Swiss-Prot record:
UniProt xrefs under HAMAP family: DsbB
Coiled coil (UniProt feature): none
Gene Ontology cellular-component annotations: plasma membrane
Membrane topology note: Multi-pass membrane protein
Job description of the protein: Required for disulfide bond formation in some periplasmic proteins. Acts by oxidizing the DsbA protein.
Subcellular compartments: Cell inner membrane
Protein name: Disulfide bond formation protein B
Top-level lineage group: Bacteria
Record-level GO BP terms: protein folding
InterPro entries in the record: DiS_bond_form_DsbB/BdbC, Disulphide_bond_form_DsbB, DsbB, DsbB-like_sf
Molecular function as annotated in GO: electron transfer activity; protein-disulfide reductase activity
Periplasmic side: 29-46, 88-144
Keywords, sorted A to Z: Cell inner membrane, Cell membrane, Chaperone, Disulfide bond, Electron transport, Membrane, Oxidoreductase, Redox-active center, Transmembrane, Transmembrane helix, Transport
Native organism: Alcanivorax borkumensis (strain ATCC 700651 / DSM 11573 / NCIMB 13689 / SK2)
Length: 167
């Protein structure tokens, strides 16, 4: 089985490029197509960026055995955190219209006015703008595509954590 698994460094580099493509795509949709991200979208971007940074450092560092596993564990944590936010976002988008939470203040305002813990609670509770589906591709909304990215990150992280040790 290990013969079909790429070496750690190229796998990390490839996953980093996938994260980079996801972020570039999100920025294109925001700045070229005018699709403003909701607070949950911004949190998902943070998850993808965290995964990208971990993968870039891992691919540049090129550690052996325990280092590969540590970077894999960190990648897995980023994927699980981002995936949880994406799952919450997908759930909000699929609520019946009468159960959608009211729109709240923007993330910038909340960060200026409220303590960080309150901001996290309010963002994860969701708001009306997070329930809107303004864009889809192949039947998936942006949070759906984020979930695909996080599933890929999770797979890479688990492969790195449980790959056979080398000498």
């Amino acid at each position: 089985m290990s013969s079909i698994i790429p070496a750690p460094r190229p796998l990390n580099a490839l996953a980093f490029l996938a994260c980079l493509a996801a972020i570039v795509g999100a920025l294109y949709l925001q700045h070229v197509d005018g699709l403003e991200p909701c607070p949950l979208c911004i949190f998902q971007r943070v998850g993808v960026i965290a995964g990208a940074v971990i993968l870039l450092i891992a691919s540049l560092h090129g550690p052996k055995n325990i280092g590969v596993r540590i970077y894999g564990a960190l990648t897995t944590l980023a994927a699980l955190g981002g995936g949880a936010v994406a799952a919450r976002h997908i759930w909000l988008q699929n609520l019946p219209a009468d159960q959608v939470p009211a729109c709240g203040p923007g993330l910038d305002y909340m960060l200026e006015v409220f303590p960080l813990q309150n901001v996290l609670q309010q963002v994860l509770a969701g708001s009306g703008e997070c329930a809107e589906m303004d864009w889809s591709f192949l039947g998936l909304s942006l949070p759906g595509w984020s979930m695909v990215v996080f599933a890929g990150l999770l797979l890479v992280g688990l492969i790195q954590m449980f790959r056979p040790l080398t000498r």
